[in-house]
Design a protein with these regions (language model features):
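Short beta-strand "wing" residues that participate in macromolecule-binding interfaces
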Residues: 65
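N-terminal helix-turn-helix DNA-binding core of bacterial DNA-binding proteins
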Residues: 8-49, 68-79
Length: 105
């Protein structure tokens, strides 16, 4: 068992656990900031799908967005917050613990 309460499955963050949101935070863990278009292309999702998942992460306080202009072109940058980076680290720790507890088949 974990020092935290309960089974490791109970420690998984439902906001982070969804595949696209986990991917967003994983990409952001490797960079200080990421352009919306790059993130969309890396994750293989539509603009609308990515926007929706970013909204969920933003509501949880896990990401922030910053809009800039390059010439006349708008550009949206996504940044993981300290809380978002901590949520990803905690989620990955819970996954590791779950895998260790279940073992290999």
């Amino acid at each position: 068992m974990t020092a935290r309460s309960g089974h490791p499955i109970l420690q998984l963050d439902e906001v982070v656990h969804q595949r696209v949101r986990l991917g967003i935070l994983a990409v952001l863990a490797e960079a200080e900031k990421v352009d919306f278009t790059h993130l969309r292309d890396v994750l293989g999702v539509t603009d609308g799908n990515l926007s929706r998942h970013l909204s969920v992460l933003h509501e949880a306080g896990y990401v922030e967005t910053h809009k800039t202009f390059e010439g006349r072109r708008p550009r949206t940058w996504i940044v993981a917050t300290k809380l978002g980076r901590r949520a990803l680290a905690d989620h990955l720790a819970a996954l590791r613990e779950l895998i260790a507890q279940v073992g290999e088949p």
